[in-house]
């Protein structure tokens, strides 16, 4: 948290939503391939399982929790041979410890997207994730039989923890659009805004509110097109159409 805070949480979360919209592999975010963006999904797991559900040493009397149990599992099992195997195994480990099917979350973050690249970060290393390995992990997670989280986990931020605790419905406000810039006024309980094209593919995603305020403004990198739609997304993932 301190590291993310030093970079400006608002900026990191803004770039995070662009990464999810692009569907990029976790090890290859293009212009956003810095360690701070890559840290976001790990922090989101702590926000949800730790701060929302209380599975943290700060709240458990036995000083256990989601991440302590993940670390203990990794400590007591043999290391896998490659970085790609380790990255994908993390999906299984987290689902096992959380007792939740986290495939959707990790898919959106690109952990289960094929990639074959050389990563240069304190030295170079190979990151290869094959479709066969992805299929194996998916099968193993599904075999656990755990339910999916009842929240839009990929959109949780430090500012929306209370939303994810209480899971209130969206209260619609008003919205205006000027070119590719959107201004949302007096919307409440919004975890994120999504702009999708006519096929339903995400074009742009924005934090519901980066800081407590009655107004949220965001700008797409692409031009607005006929057929685009905007949705306000609640903590549960329920979507409310935004009209202008």
Segments the model singles out, each with a brief description of its role:
Residues 2-13:
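Single conserved hydrophobic/aromatic residue that forms the stacking wall/gate
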Residues 14-118, 122, 127-130:
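Active-site-proximal alpha-helical
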Residues 82-244:
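Beta/coil-rich, acidic/histidine-enriched accessory regions frequently appended to metallopeptidases
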């Amino acid at each position: 948290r301190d590291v993310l805070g030093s970079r400006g949480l608002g900026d990191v979360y803004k770039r995070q939503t662009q990464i999810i919209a692009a569907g990029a592999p976790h090890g290859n975010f293009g212009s956003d391939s810095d360690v701070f963006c890559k840290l976001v999904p790990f922090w989101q797991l702590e926000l949800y399982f730790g701060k929302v559900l209380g599975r943290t040493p700060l709240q458990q009397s036995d000083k256990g929790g989601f991440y302590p149990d993940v670390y203990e599992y990794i400590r007591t099992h043999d290391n896998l041979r490659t970085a790609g195997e380790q990255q994908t195994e993390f999906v299984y480990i987290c689902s096992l410890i959380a007792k939740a099917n986290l495939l959707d979350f990790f898919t959106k973050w690109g952990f289960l997207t094929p990639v074959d690249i050389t990563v240069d970060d304190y030295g170079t290393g190979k990151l290869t994730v094959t479709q066969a390995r992805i299929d194996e992990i998916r099968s193993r997670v599904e075999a656990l039989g755990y339910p999916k989280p009842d929240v839009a986990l990929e959109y949780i931020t430090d500012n929306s923890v209370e939303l994810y605790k209480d899971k209130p419905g969206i209260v619609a406000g008003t919205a205006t659009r000027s070119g590719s810039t959107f201004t949302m006024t007096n919307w409440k309980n919004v975890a994120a805004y999504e702009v999708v094209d006519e096929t339903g593919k995400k074009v742009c995603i924005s934090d519901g509110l980066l800081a407590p305020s009655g107004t949220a403004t965001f700008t797409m990198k692409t031009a607005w097109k006929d057929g685009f739609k905007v949705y306000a997304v609640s903590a549960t993932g329920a979507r409310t159409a935004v009209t202008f």
